[in-house]
Regions:
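Short Gly/charged-rich anion-binding patches and loops
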Residues: 8, 36, 112
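N-terminal pre-P-loop "Q-motif" helix
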Residues: 2-17, 180-183
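Low-complexity, intrinsically disordered short peptide segments enriched in small/polar/basic residues
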Residues: 10, 30-31, 35, 76, ...
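A basic/glycine-biased coupling hinge at the interface between accessory DNA-binding modules
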Residues: 17-20, 39-188
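Walker A/P-loop
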Residues: 17-36
Length: 190
């Protein structure tokens, strides 16, 4: 089962006393370690539905799913293997009502975000909307809402952006929509 793993990789696979952080460069075998760890946990009696493996990209999730299937067969369908954003969507579909969202909320693409920001800011300039989006994204990734962002603005441009953010958030709530940053930030509030 653990063929092809070096000593450090085997230690990570067999470590069971809590979380295990695997740090390694590209092509070094992280996916192999994680999929073997999944197989080891299932062999040790942990139900597959209690295991989650979260990645950054859809490509990595698909690769991990295929490798897990190769090691554990049909049990792989019960392991949650997805991206951080997909996990956020799943959590928000299940419990988003706590945040005022219906289960069938919409996820905005980049063009939708730009359009709503232009409307919220009263501007027809896409470059201005992209600048607002960049700053709002930064604030959201810091865990700030519009009111909190306004409390820490450094200049008039940020003050305008915080005002646009407040209007943008109002529109998202009215449209029952979220952007990609919300898929990471909102589940943290659940």
């Amino acid at each position: 089962m653990s063929a092809g793993l070096n000593l450090a990789q085997l230690q990570a696979v067999h470590y069971t006393d809590g979380p295990c952080l695997v740090l390694a460069g590209a092509g070094s075998g992280k996916t192999r370690v994680i999929t073997h760890k999944i197989a080891h946990m299932i062999d040790a009696g942990l139900p597959a539905k209690r295991i989650a493996a979260i990645t950054f990209t859809n490509k990595a999730a698909a690769e991990m799913r295929e490798r897990a299937k190769g090691l554990i067969g049909r049990a792989a369908k019960d392991v949650l293997i997805c991206t951080f954003h997909a996990l956020g969507v799943r959590m928000m579909r299940e419990d988003g009502k706590v945040l005022g969202l219906k289960a069938q909320f919409s996820i905005l693409d980049a063009d939708d975000v730009t359009s709503i920001l232009k409307d919220a800011g009263g501007s027809s300039d896409a470059a201005t909307a992209r600048q607002w989006q960049w700053t709002i994204s930064k604030w959201k990734n810091m865990g700030l809402n519009a009111e909190q962002a306004m409390a820490q603005v450094a200049d008039d441009n940020e003050r305008i952006t915080a005002t646009v953010m407040a209007r943008y958030e109002e529109r998202l709530a009215a449209y029952q929509s979220v952007d990609f940053d919300d898929l990471i930030g909102m589940p943290l509030k659940l």
